[in-house]
Amino acid sequence: MISFFLCERGIFCFSGLFCGRMKGMKSYNSLNDYYRKLFGEKTFKVPIDAGFDCPNRDGTVAHGGCTFCTVSGSGDAIVAPDAPIREQFYKEIDFMHRKWPDVRKYLVYFQNFTNTHEKLEVIRERYEQAINEPGVVGLNIGTRPDCLPDETIAYLADLSERMHVTVELGLQTTYEETSDLINRAHSYELYVETVQRVRKLAPKAEIVSHLINGLPGETHDMMLENVRRCVTDNDIQGIKLHLLHLMTNTRMQRDYHEGRLQLLSQEEYVSIVCDQLEIIPEHIVIHRITGDAPRDMLIGPMWSLNKWEVLNAIETEMRRRGSKQGCKAKEQRFVC
């Protein structure tokens, strides 16, 4: 049956498949828009190095860490990573206020390495050094599915009664062969099970899945399948789409120099991301569709340094297609 409906952008859509956009509006559910609705104003996400490690670095499950990861564990942009946690917080917001002097609400973001890879008393002591500061309205935690025991999730549930809590759960790929190749040292099955436990034990906490486009051996179709599995198998509230940045002093650097890794072109990346956005249900918040890397550490792709050019290229392609997030999304099948 042919049907028309008025979508949330005020556009009449044909069976939900024609996804035209109004000029000047993003074609996806952006994090900035979400936070403005949630908190009523622009809100800073304040990255902090809390001194945790990773289980695939310290020998708990493996050694060496993920092959794409630098020695800072994705915390290369943190202003003062060696300072005490509270001092880091204020140095970060002082730095951000140079560009946005009027922002007064903050989300503490324990970003690099695995920020639940410790005993609960250690986790609690480190978190509490930052989350009680004036203006803090939420907590974002970067972690892995093998580092969330029930007692830690229960603590996050308690925190979610006080503030907005987001568990940023690293996945990177749903393919076991890729996961082994990059030394993730956990399975996709464990990821799905962990998402289910977090949803059950800490229902107010939001879950954001991290995926990387451009991992060794993964094709366009495989990257699309990563997203499809992620959003249909898991009750998640957000997703981060990263471009693989090849960095100096990483194990993946060797793969590249030995010809086992082909970096994506900007055109390939834009095409992949637009295809992915179309199959992500529109209620899922897009926390990232590209990323940042320090120029002095980046081997490639060098085009990724022009972040706004990449963002504009994605938006331009979505507009050319007459498309928007979720226009090709399938029914979700996760178990609540």
What role is predicted for each listed range?
Residues K91-E133, G138:
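A contiguous, low-structure linker/loop signature
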Residues V46-I48, Y106-V108, L139-I141, V165-L169, ...:
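Hydrophobic faces of well-ordered beta-strands that scaffold small-molecule active sites
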Residues C66, A130-V136, E225-K240, L311, ...:
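Structural recognition of alpha->loop->beta junctions
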Residues K23-D33, K42-F44, G238, H245-C336:
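Auxiliary Fe-S-binding modules of radical SAM enzymes
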Residues E133-V136, R197-I207, D233-N234, I272-V285:
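A structural motif corresponding to the C-terminal end of an alpha-helix
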Residues M22-I85, Y90-L107:
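N-terminal [4Fe-4S]-dependent radical SAM core
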Residues D76-A83, N112-E125, L139-A202, N213-N234, ...:
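Conserved non-cysteine loop/helix-boundary elements of the Radical SAM core domain that shape
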